[in-house]
């Protein structure tokens, strides 16, 4: 009984220390930028590749909100001044609205892909 209680206590303490370390990493390094994974352009969906090409050539964009300033209120991208990031829609087959997929870019071209409406991001590697 004592050994089981001790094991549970060690497990709970380990979880606490891990969560504290992650929270500290996020707060000390500006918006959790160290936690962002990456994705190669070739690994993106065909729709994301088309959107990325339109971004690089400056349009024309299929959605009126494409190119608007992205506020990064979710604080999941590296911290920058307001106006640095702009968002663009990635068309989602079978969805009548804009859907959840986005590409967010800063200047110089530093782009991130989100397939879950800004919950997670992957930096796009050329």
Regions from the PLM with identified roles:
Residues 8, 28, 103-104:
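Small/flexible residues
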């Amino acid at each position: 009984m004592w050994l089981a209680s001790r094991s549970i206590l060690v497990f709970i303490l380990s979880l606490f220390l891990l969560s504290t370390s992650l929270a500290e990493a996020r707060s000390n390094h500006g918006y959790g930028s160290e936690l962002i994974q990456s994705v190669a352009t070739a690994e993106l969906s065909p729709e994301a590749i088309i959107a990325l090409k339109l971004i690089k050539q400056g349009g024309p964009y299929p959605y009126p909100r494409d190119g608007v300033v992205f506020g990064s209120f979710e604080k999941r991208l590296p911290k920058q001044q307001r106006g640095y990031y702009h968002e663009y829609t990635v068309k989602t087959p079978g969805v009548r609205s804009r859907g959840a997929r986005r590409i967010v870019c800063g200047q110089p071209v530093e782009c991130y892909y989100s397939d879950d409406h800004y919950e997670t991001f992957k930096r796009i590697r050329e």
